[in-house]
Amino acid sequence: GGPSGGCIPAEHFDIPIDYDNLIAIGSMMGSGGLIVMDETDCMVDIAKFFLEFTVEESCGKCTPCRIGTKRMLEILTRIVNNEGSLEDLDLLETLANTITETSLCGLGQSACKPVQSTLKYFRDEYLAHVVDHHCPICNKEKPHPTIDPEKCKGCGKCRKNCPMEAITG
């Protein structure tokens, strides 16, 4: 569903992909695209990333979407920066429900799905940020691919197998 779809955990990967099944687990078909992530992606950071898109795309006509999503983004930013609190999680849920129920268009009505679904399925990652004030995922160094010039012949055969898509040309 992209930025206005929900984030679902691996336990739901075997459900048939159709409108009703996705809605039942807190997601939606959206544009029909799927983004697959792994254990190196912090779902709190992903929810923030998707909400940034929504804030940018809001037309500003209705207050819930125009102001509510900005408030949610401020809260998520605090949480990602390990400065949030348990009360922020409750506030996110309240804002998300209000925005979903009172926005005038589809963007506002679906804008909070990534936050709602990550709070539901990846709550432990939020708790790491607000209770431990340290996210083991965000604070881990992401892999930095390197090419060994002694082994690389420049043929490009390994390009399609590089998980980081670091090999170009």
Language-model-detected regions and their locations in the chain:
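Redox cofactor-anchoring modules in respiratory/redox and cofactor-processing assemblies
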Residues: 1-144
